[in-house]
Structures are given as structure tokens and as C-alpha cells.
Amino acid sequence: EVSAVNAGVKEVREVIASAKHALMASGEETVLFIDEVHRFSKSQQDALLPAVENQWISHVAATTENPSFSVISPLLSRSLLLVLHPLDDEAIGETLQRALKSASGLNAAVELGEGSLGVLTRIAGGDARKALTLLEAAAAATLDRGDRLITVEDVSTAAASALVRWDEDQH
């Protein structure tokens, strides 16, 4: 995994060299995940081309930007583009219900009060990550006050503090 925020051309070339060596030495294939590829400069993206063209790596890149504008044409033409669409309200609701019940989630420590699910779903706007983050914040506030029932007010309060973070980094 390479983060476009932290990696330079040198780091990209090191990963590619390591992947090429692993492929030649043992046949081991490397999948390189590049988060926020839109933050890669043209030279960083150019550094990937030989590895992609020669199949030394399989690359998976994630971006919140339009790749037609943020990814260089030669790299884009050698990529399979998958567009992810916002989830519908039903899918967000199901995700939140699973998180409430799951042992790896909130483990039934809290319940949603009347109207809370609708508010969570509306604020999430099709983004499951945002919905889960908001649920977690509302659950923490509810438990902090010694209750188990997440109210609409809990969700609104959690959203008000979380919106500041979401606005700053758009996540």
C-alpha cells in the first residue's frame, strides 16, 4: 500500500523494484494499492507506467476525484475504472443495524430511538463510512451519559462535531 499523500517517486520506484524482484525470484505477484492517487504528481504517475505495462504489479488506485482529470492518460488507459455510487437509504440502514448488533461493532450496547435511524441515514448521504462514524460518535455520547437509547438529539450533536472534521478533509 502506498499513500499518495506521503510517497514520492523514490518510494514508488522502491516498491516497484521489490515487486519486480519478487516476481522474478519466486513468481510472487504484487498488488499495489494507491490511496488518493489524485494527489500523485505527473512524475509519480509516470514512474508507475513501466511496472503496469510490464505487469510487474497489479495496481488498484482509489480517488475521490474525477480520474479523467487527475490521472494521466497513459495510466488511465491501462486501468479498469470502477465507479462507486452512493448507497441507498435501505443499504445504509442495514449497515447501521449490523453494526449495532455485531460483536465486532457495538455489540448491542445501544439501541436506536425513534427517528434516529432516519436522521443517521439522511446525514450519511449514501456514505457508509460516514454513517458508521456518526453512529459510533452518537453511541459514545449516549453511553457517556449512562443511557442505552440513542436519541435524535444524540445524532444531531454527534453530527455537529463530526461535520467540522468532514469539511476539513472531505471524508
PLM features: residue spans?
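Alpha-helical scaffold elements adjacent to nucleotide-binding pockets in ATP/GTP-utilizing enzyme cores
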Residues: 11-18, 47, 51, 74-78, ...
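C-terminal engagement/docking regions of AAA+ P-loop ATPases
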Residues: 150-171
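Conserved RecA-like P-loop NTPase ATPase core
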Residues: 12, 35, 48, 63, ...
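Helix-loop-helix "sensor" segment of P-loop NTPases
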Residues: 96-117
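C-terminal helical "lid" of AAA+/P-loop NTPase domains
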Residues: 118-123, 129-144, 154
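Conserved AAA+ ATPase "SRH/arginine-finger" region at the nucleotide-binding site
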Residues: 3-6, 80-93
